């Protein structure tokens, strides 16, 4: 497969308490965050803006009676943990077509009262990464993200993701992504999915696991 313009759009850090996790990341790493919103499937989040438009998503249970809220509570099993990684692509429809995947529409009620929509492909293949496209002009998204970065008030000057550690074999991941060129490190013998992530900062690389 071609590279398809893949980049790490965001990493999902599943947490028991979104606000408490945000405070801990501020205290331990100097990472600020901004309010996110409520996904219609029953999860809620805060956003840690990194080099625009990438981010670390703090994802918690918003409504434990809805499907995604139930799934997240089960996946966390009583502890905060890295949960998933998400890739942006040039053309979501083409990426989905090449893999025989349907696309799905997601919606989110934002803290500012607005509503955002996005499309995904590949979410049922968890914990392999899924693909995402936001229904917003790329230039407008970049401006929003630059403002969020300022509003977060980071103490460490975070930049881009420097690496991801995953338990999936190179063969499995290459079959899923193709020639991706992403900064992925494989951990032999580890369970499938993401285990650690590196973030470039003005203080040096920080690692969350």
Task: Report the location of each language-model feature.
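Glycine/small-residue-rich interface belts in oligomeric ring/scaffold proteins
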Residues: 16-76
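Short coil/turn motifs at beta-sheet boundaries
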Residues: 41, 78-80, 125
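Vicinal oxygen chelate
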Residues: 6-17, 46-51, 56-57, 70-169, 181-209, ...
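Amphipathic alpha-helical segments
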Residues: 18-29, 94-99, 169-180
């Amino acid at each position: 497969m071609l590279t398809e313009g893949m980049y790490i759009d965001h990493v999902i850090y599943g947490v028991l308490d979104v606000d408490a996790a945000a405070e801990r990341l501020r205290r331990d790493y100097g990472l600020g965050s901004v309010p996110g919103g409520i996904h219609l499937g029953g999860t809620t989040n805060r956003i840690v803006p990194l080099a625009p438009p990438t981010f670390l998503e703090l994802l918690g249970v918003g409504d434990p009676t809805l499907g995604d809220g139930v799934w997240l509570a089960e996946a966390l099993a009583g502890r905060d943990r890295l949960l998933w990684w998400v890739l942006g692509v040039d053309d979501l429809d083409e990426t989905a077509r090449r893999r025989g995947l349907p696309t799905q529409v997601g919606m989110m009620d934002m803290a500012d009262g607005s509503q955002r929509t996005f499309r995904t492909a590949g979410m049922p293949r968890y914990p392999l990464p899924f693909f995402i496209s936001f229904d917003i002009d790329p230039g407008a998204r970049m401006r929003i993200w630059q403002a969020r970065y300022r509003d977060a008030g980071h103490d460490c000057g975070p930049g881009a993701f420097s690496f991801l550690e995953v338990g999936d074999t190179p063969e499995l991941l290459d079959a899923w992504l193709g020639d991706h060129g992403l900064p992925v490190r494989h951990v032999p013998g580890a369970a499938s999915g993401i285990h650690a992530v590196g973030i470039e900062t003005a203080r040096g690389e920080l690692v969350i696991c």
